[in-house]
Amino acid sequence: MEGPLTIPVLDKGFVRLVDQMGDDRAIVQAARVSYGEGTKTVREDAALIDYLMRHRHTSPFEMVVFKFHVKAPIFVARQWFRHRTASVNEISGRYSILKEEFYEPEAFRKQAKRNKQASEGALLDEEALALLRKVQQEAYGAYRALLEKGVAREMARMVLPLNLYTEFYWKQDLHNLFHFLKLRLAPEAQWEIRQYARAIAEIVKERVPLAWAAFEEHLLEGAFLSRTELRALRGLLTPEVYEKALSSLGLGGSRLKEALEKVFGPGEAL
């Protein structure tokens, strides 16, 4: 792998690609263990990866692993670590004196009226930003004062706020990394973690372009339909109309047949 790729995020954070095991070829090689020798060209590799993605054959994607070095506010890291399939190692406030680095947003956001866990719109309030700076400065001052009094680092850190920056290494396989991106790129995800997800997406798109294209087509920009939703679609569409629409978008052959069967079932598809 080439030298480290670092993308700045927020005011003081970053995402850095530390290491990578495998690429698009590793996905294809893993699949061929199951399917035998077959595809050889890039076009055929892309078709195989697309097939694996749309049929939810996940294990070949787990053969690719990314390791990132991340610097993010603690409140972002706590959301991040909810994705428990990764291997994580974070800087320790027990062993190290934590730096005076805080995330300061350009503006606060207002509480969303319809979603208790979301925000909306900008709240341009200089007094609110001044209050944030005052509290974080006082908290870090108390932290240093406790250390100077001989209080253990593991206890002195209790006074530090959640907008303090932390750093961690995060190692994740591509299948679960795509799941992370599906959730954290979504509009309802908190704005701050979306910026980190976008940085990771930029790296992943460059490193595994065929897998990214399949992910974007079937998961990131795709949707799952419930039984009720399928019934509603069947009431509005005919196989003929749907086939014409799919064909106009360039879908043909087995992919066209598969798409028709997804909505109308094997017995009704043309």
Curated annotation (Swiss-Prot):
Keywords: FAD, Flavoprotein, Methyltransferase, NADP, Nucleotide biosynthesis, Transferase. Its cofactor is FAD. DUMP binds at residues 79-82, 90-94, 157, 184. Pathway: Pyrimidine metabolism; dTTP biosynthesis. The active site is at 184 (involved in ionization of n3 of dump, leading to its activation). GO terms for biological process: dTMP biosynthetic process; dTTP biosynthetic process; methylation. FAD binds at residues 59, 82-84, 90, 173-175, 179. The keyword Methyltransferase applies. Binds 4 FAD per tetramer. Each FAD binding site is formed by three monomers. Residues 13-218 form the ThyX domain. A motif (ThyX motif) lies at residues 82-92. Its EC number is 2.1.1.148. GO terms for molecular function: flavin adenine dinucleotide binding; NADPH binding; thymidylate synthase (FAD) activity; thymidylate synthase activity. It catalyses: dUMP + (6R)-5,10-methylene-5,6,7,8-tetrahydrofolate + NADPH + H(+) = dTMP + (6S)-5,6,7,8-tetrahydrofolate + NADP(+). Catalyzes the reductive methylation of 2'-deoxyuridine-5'-monophosphate (dUMP) to 2'-deoxythymidine-5'-monophosphate (dTMP) while utilizing 5,10-methylenetetrahydrofolate (mTHF) as the methyl donor, and NADPH and FADH(2) as the reductant. PANTHER family: FLAVIN-DEPENDENT THYMIDYLATE SYNTHASE. Belongs to the thymidylate synthase ThyX family. Homotetramer. This is Flavin-dependent thymidylate synthase. It comes from Thermus thermophilus (strain ATCC 27634 / DSM 579 / HB8). The gene is thyX.
